[in-house]
Amino acid sequence: MEIKGLRKIEPYVAGSQPAEKNIIKLNTNENAYGPSPAVHQALASFDAHQLRKYSTLDQTALRQALSDQLGVPTDQFIIGNGSDDILSMAFLAFFNSEEKIIFPDLTYGFYKVWADLYRIPFREVPLTSSFEIDTQDYLVENGGIILTNPNAPTGIYKPLDQVEEIVKANQSVVVIIDESYINFGGETALPLLEKYDNVFITRTFSKDASLAGLRVGYGIGSPKLMAVINAVKNSVNPYNVDSIAEALGTAAVRSWDYYEDICAKIMATRDWFSQELQAIGFDVLPSKTNFVLVKPYGVTAGQLFAYLQSKKIYVRYFPKVERISDRLRISIGTQDEMERVLMTIQELQA
């Protein structure tokens, strides 16, 4: 018998997590360098007896650490179980079922999923032929805007003055700026918080802070926005961040010098790798992230993807996404790893 009322949902397709050992994993934009020594120490010294109790409701220690680091009052932060948790709540808090929200046609795939799930109408705005966000496309009537900056999967960064132009022209709706990759060479939109109360910024600990397996993220916004999204949080899952995540996230923020150093290494390797690929004919989009989106030379994206995988090198291929089906997204690992990737590519070209 048919069961009534079941939702038809097209889910987000996450990158694979191979169980093999001795691989080079460059398909989900993780950080190859690992957490700081302070995080290791915080994990080793965590009192497991604390786990008998629920976690804190407001993650005071982590919010204070972030406030000290970024110079934003503690009451303008909300902590989540990864930035996906924050973004999901933001869709519920800031958008409605009457007005279309807008976001790029090539961006984080979850935006479309959340819009469908929460029955929020949306319009995907095509990137330019050079895969950039055209400011003029966002100076139109809408019910909200979501921009990933730098963007994914392109890696392209939109300068802050252009982002501000979009924010300034849309002060009657919320503009979400997903800064998952901001610490790989971009300029943060945090200064806009002092000028506009419709800006909501999200960040994750999964990329720069090497804590993808922990699931910690946060949002930053005006008191007006925080009141609404906190109401959503407390209506859905008040205890959304576990005690270990708060302790280790706090340790990461308090040891941020370590992460600045490894981000600098990743950026240097990214720029070197991009130049080397261009030298052998690849088209490489300019990146301010911990990955590059490349169009191979001499072989198809599918052929290169299969060859790399046969050598236990995992990258991301988007065969069903028409505009980038001829490209691969390659996360930036250590210098040694990327040298091995380059050698493997050259082997196929030979």
UniProtKB/Swiss-Prot annotation:
Enzyme kind, highest EC tier: transferase
Keyword list, A-Z: Amino-acid biosynthesis, Aminotransferase, Histidine biosynthesis, Pyridoxal phosphate, Transferase
Pathway(s) where this gene product acts: Amino-acid biosynthesis; L-histidine biosynthesis; L-histidine from 5-phospho-alpha-D-ribose 1-diphosphate: step 7/9
Keyword Metal-binding belongs to the record: no
Catalytic activity of the protein: L-histidinol phosphate + 2-oxoglutarate = 3-(imidazol-4-yl)-2-oxopropyl phosphate + L-glutamate
Required co-factors: pyridoxal 5'-phosphate
Assigned protein family: Belongs to the class-II pyridoxal-phosphate-dependent aminotransferase family. Histidinol-phosphate aminotransferase subfamily.
Subunit structure: Homodimer.
Name of this protein: Histidinol-phosphate aminotransferase
Lineage of the organism: Bacteria, Bacillati, Bacillota, Bacilli, Lactobacillales
Chain's gene name: hisC
